[in-house]
UniProtKB/Swiss-Prot annotation:
Top-level taxonomy: Bacteria, Pseudomonadati, Pseudomonadota, Gammaproteobacteria, Enterobacterales
Protein name: Chloramphenicol acetyltransferase
UniProt source species: Escherichia coli
Reaction(s) this enzyme catalyzes, per UniProt: chloramphenicol + acetyl-CoA = chloramphenicol 3-acetate + CoA
Record GO terms (molecular function): chloramphenicol O-acetyltransferase activity
Active site residues of this protein: H79
Length: 210
């Protein structure tokens, strides 16, 4: 099978890959999938991608997504563990014995990934999860609960390891929301973005936005 990626050292922007209308992506977010060989569309695990009522995968800007990351979509995918059987009879209703089966599909709500989020290789995000801006998801983490902004999580199930910055610094970053700035403003702020000088960037931003 031909590898969708030419090199393990360079990802591709999601805007260049995504064809599924249920996946919404921001600017400059990328997927580096060389070691798994497929485009980002295959990272979103939909049961029926053309259904009108499926949950959406919404990804912000400037996100970094490692090879083999998976987003489990389409709600419960037709399995009801509160019924006698979790088997999805409805999706095999061409079988006469299953003709009276009921569609067990339930939405979980949209999966929303904030901006400037780093998702490690082979991490798995469960349905309906919300991941805050600036979060870091460790490789092979199984994320079954929402993740707060600028929080590093890892493990199975994923648990909080630590915050990236102090609460005051996180408040500054969320207030600035640099990922929404025009490119020219980002260009001018690049020396600050590539440093740990959050307070300095915040003071500069306050001066330009006054």
């Amino acid at each position: 099978m031909t590898n969708y990626f030419e090199s393990p050292f360079k990802g591709k922007l999601l805007t260049e890959q995504v064809k599924n209308p249920n996946i919404k992506v921001g600017r400059y977010s990328y997927y580096s999938g060389y070691y798994h060989g497929h485009s980002f569309d295959d990272c979103a695990r939909y049961l029926l991608p053309d259904r009108d009522d499926v949950d959406q995968l919404i990804i912000g800007s400037f996100c970094s997504i490692g090879s083999g990351a998976a987003f489990i979509m389409a709600g419960n995918q037709g399995h009801r563990y509160d019924w006698v059987s979790s088997f999805p009879f409805f999706y095999m209703n061409e079988e006469p014995a299953f003709a009276k089966s009921v569609d067990a599909f339930q939405r979980a709500g949209d999966t929303v990934i904030g901006s400037d989020v780093w998702i490690g290789s082979e991490a798995m995000i469960m349905p309906g999860i919300k991941i805050g801006h600036g979060a870091v998801i460790g490789s092979r983490a199984l994320v079954a609960k929402d993740v707060e902004p600028y929080t590093i999580v890892g493990g199975n199930p994923a648990k909080s390891i630590r915050k990236r910055f102090s609460e005051e610094e996180i408040s500054m970053l969320l207030d600035m929301a640099w990922w929404d700035w025009p490119l020219e403003q980002i260009k001018e702020a690049m020396p600050f973005l590539c440093s740990s000088g959050i307070a300095s960037l915040y003071r500069r931003w306050q001066g330009t936005s006054a």
